[in-house]
Regions:
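A glycine-rich, Thr/Ser-enriched phosphate-binding loop motif common to dinucleotide/cofactor-binding enzymes
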Residues: 165-182
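N-terminal ligand-binding/catalytic initiation module
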Residues: 2-164
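Conserved small/polar residues in nucleotide/adenosyl-binding loops
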Residues: 191-193
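Conserved helix-loop functional segments at active or binding sites
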Residues: 181-189
């Protein structure tokens, strides 16, 4: 049975058209501040931006106050285990990572950016993610083949000071637990009838 049988029917062309309609892809970056005047632009960039830069240099935690860091998640993959498709490579995983980013925005109002790392080397991936981690409030690892996904997650938890969410592991555990809780609720309600 094809996975498409479980959802509303659509053609391959419709799926491709969805991704190319309007601006290609599914995400964009917009300003959270009004940029209507030259003064607004001067505050957003130079020279006004120097003030929060200095504050963050004195206290890195203030980045959560002056930047989007606290509401910004990186969705990261190397494309080695894309959904049910397998290893299609880093760039082929981009539509999935963009899709996860829009889910973060739609259901939790969390800003997210997709990052595709063109490497199968766990140490290289760990190094890359650890070097960019200060930009984000959290990291979501997605569609990275086992056992590398577990190695990457464990090492990153030791190296960085932000949450590391391994979607294929933690997401499955959360969904399974939710299913069990709901099944118990139903079973208990039937017992009490």
């Amino acid at each position: 049975m094809n996975k498409k049988d479980n959802i509303e029917k659509y053609s391959d062309k419709e799926a491709l058209d969805f991704h190319t309609g309007g601006k290609p892809g599914k995400i964009e970056i917009i300003s959270s501040k009004d940029l209507a005047t030259q003064r607004d632009l001067a505050l957003a960039y130079s020279p006004g931006v120097a003030v929060p830069c200095i504050e963050i240099s004195k206290n890195e935690q203030s980045a959560y106050d002056y930047t989007s860091k606290g509401n910004l998640v990186a969705v990261i993959s190397n494309g080695s285990a894309i959904l049910g498709l397998g290893d299609l490579g880093a760039l082929a995983s981009k539509p999935v990572m963009e899709g996860k980013s829009v889910l973060f925005k739609r259901f939790a109002d969390i800003d997210s950016i997709d990052i595709e790392i063109d490497s199968k080397d766990s140490n290289e991936i760990i190094n890359c993610i650890s070097k960019i981690s200060k930009t984000f409030g959290g990291i979501n690892l997605e569609d990275i083949a086992a056992p590398d996904c577990f190695i990457i997650e464990e090492k990153l938890k030791q190296l960085v000071d932000i949450p590391i969410f391994h979607d294929d592991q933690h997401g499955t555990a959360i969904i399974t637990t939710a299913g069990l809780i709901n099944a118990l609720d139903i079973a208990l309600s039937l017992i009490h009838i």
